[in-house]
Amino acid sequence: MFYLFNSNKMFFLFILFFSTMISISSNSWFGCWIGLEINLLSFIPLISNSNNLLASEASLKYFLTQSIASMNFLFSILMKMILMKNFEMNNLISIMINSALLMKMGSAPFHFWFPNISEGLSWFNNFILMTWQKITPFILLSYYFNINFLYFIIILNVMIGAIGGLNQTSLRKMMSFSSINNLGWMIYAMMISENLWMFYFTMYSFMISIMFFFFYLLNMFFINQLFINNMNFLIKLNLMINFLSLGGLPPFLGFLPKWIIINFLMINKFYILTFIMVMSSLITIYFYIRIIFSCFMFNYLKLKWLKINLNNKLMNFINLFSLISILGMILSTFLFF
């Protein structure tokens, strides 16, 4: 549901954006924590819906998990200031602060709440959860991180994100595991450079915005809906392009940020980490291709329940973004010359 005609939702959406600005522009850890709390309290009214039991359950689960993460974060920064009197690097404290922020963004191994909550949300709320809600924890993580701990987290993210999405029938759960997988890539991008993280994050947000807009228009929440709906060839082609781009298959736009990260990994001789990350991407591409293949192959069946007709303006809009996904990689080659 979009919030253009609901003043209450628009107000909380504004507070949500404003709270992120408070956190990322604060010059103290306590100010960052206040921003995180305002962010939590503004997102709950957006996702709670008295008419939808799953949404109400998701808002309660979100509140509990984020509260635990906030308490851990506050406890860690207070303990650091009391015991150490400064913010020099300390392994135990840095791991505690990193763990709290990773739990905030739904990273593995603190990801157990993430797919369950995404299952109860609308596509628009899922988009906010998987993009905007990750900005503050990521920027705070970039200020103070434990390198060895984050390498372990990256491996967990890419593996759990890939394997967890294999047996899913819900599109929302599948996209949440895909988000966990991409989180591993984003954490490494953040460790290399904040600019590279921002570039990866922008590309990822662009790709999933197309996918979520697509699912919102077609009112799709489960994989079997792709088979029972009578979609024309152009809609299926657009779906295929965007799925493959999200998976990071060349020559689509989604491959570009992964290519840059693989390049950095190979230069720094992280061969095992490169192998694990590339193999995990192959697994995610496998479950995307499985959906696309079924969607195309089941076309001969006449047992279609719903005929989908998108108006020309919406179709042109989707076609434009799919074209950007195809041409983005070709145009990006000019950036290096």
Model-derived segments and spans:
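Core, highly hydrophobic multi-pass alpha-helical transmembrane subunits of bioenergetic inner membranes
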Residues: M1-F337
